[in-house]
Structure formats: structure tokens, C-alpha cells
Regions:
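Positively charged n-region of N-terminal signal peptides that target proteins for export
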Residues: 1-4
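Short acidic-glycine-tyrosine-enriched beta hairpin
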Residues: 55, 68, 91, 96-117
Length: 155
């Protein structure tokens, strides 16, 4: 029995050693960012991927999202927890299934941590804002009101 426990522990340790972090060292200067339209949020929003592949499971993803002035990302959820840091501009972070766009706009440097599957929304005031979003892939967004989903709209 002791041998069985020993070998079980040994296999578990070997498995965890093989599953060690595969993230590579990376330095991404701001002028190296490649901004692209982000089809997952309303028209005008852009994204730049700094690290990782948001389509891959288990991968650490760091991305910046550029939000125009007077902009709303309607209430939505993600299948993952996310950590958002406001880089520039001012934004409001709201919780719930209905947006009211009320409350004080956060200042650069503010951190917003949101658990998986918690409805939230983001809005800007009269200036553009950039947020940095970190999560473990794969990425995903589900709008509370399907009519708000820009991927389902035809222009």
C-alpha cells in the first residue's frame, strides 16, 4: 500500500513537472503594439495582443483594449476571471445585467478584478481609454442581451 501511494505521488509530481509554465520571457514596448478592430465588442473598439493566444486553452493572455470616447461595452460575462488595469483615459466599471453608466469614472492605474461568469459592463466618458486585460484562455464574451452582441449584427 505504501508503495502504491509512493508511486502515485511520484506520478503526480512528474505530471506537474511536465505541466510547468510554458510562458516565455517577453518585452513589448508600446510602439510595437498592433491595433486591430475587435469584433467581440461594439464598433470602434480595438485590441492589441501583447502576450498569448486568446484562442488557446490554458494560455496566459494579456491584451490591451482601446475604447473610444462616449462608448459602452454592454453587460456581458466571460467564462474566465479577468484582471483589468486602466492604462489611460477614464472608464466606468459597472456590475450587473443592466447598464446605468452612473458612478465615478476610474483613473489610470485602477485595477478591476472580475470573477468568471459575473455580469459587468464598461463605459467611457468624453475621452478615449485604454485598458489592459489579463486572463487564462480561451477568450470568450457572452452578452446578457443577445441583441447587444456585435458579432450578430449586420451592417
Amino acid at each position: 500500500m505504501k508503495q502504491l501511494l509512493f508511486f502515485g505521488a511520484l506520478i503526480a509530481l512528474a505530471g506537474s513537472a511536465l505541466a510547468q509554465d510554458v510562458m516565455k520571457v517577453a518585452t513589448v514596448p508600446p510602439d510595437a503594439l498592433v491595433w486591430k478592430d475587435n469584433p467581440n465588442i461594439p464598433k470602434g473598439g480595438q485590441v492589441a495582443i501583447l502576450l498569448g493566444d486568446p484562442t488557446k486553452a490554458g494560455e496566459v493572455v494579456v491584451q490591451r483594449v482601446k475604447l473610444p470616447a462616449n462608448y459602452l461595452v454592454p453587460p456581458h460575462t466571460h467564462p474566465y476571471a479577468e484582471t483589468v488595469t486602466l492604462i489611460s483615459g477614464r472608464v466606468g466599471f459597472g456590475m450587473g445585467e443592466k447598464s446605468d453608466n452612473k458612478g465615478e469614472l476610474a483613473k489610470p492605474g485602477t485595477l478591476f478584478a472580475n470573477p468568471a461568469k459575473h455580469a459587468h459592463y464598461v463605459w467611457t466618458g468624453n475621452e478615449e481609454a485604454i485598458v489592459q486585460v489579463q486572463f487564462i484562455g480561451p477568450g470568450g464574451i457572452d452578452y446578457i442581451n443577445p441583441a447587444d452582441d456585435p458579432r450578430k449584427k449586420t451592417n
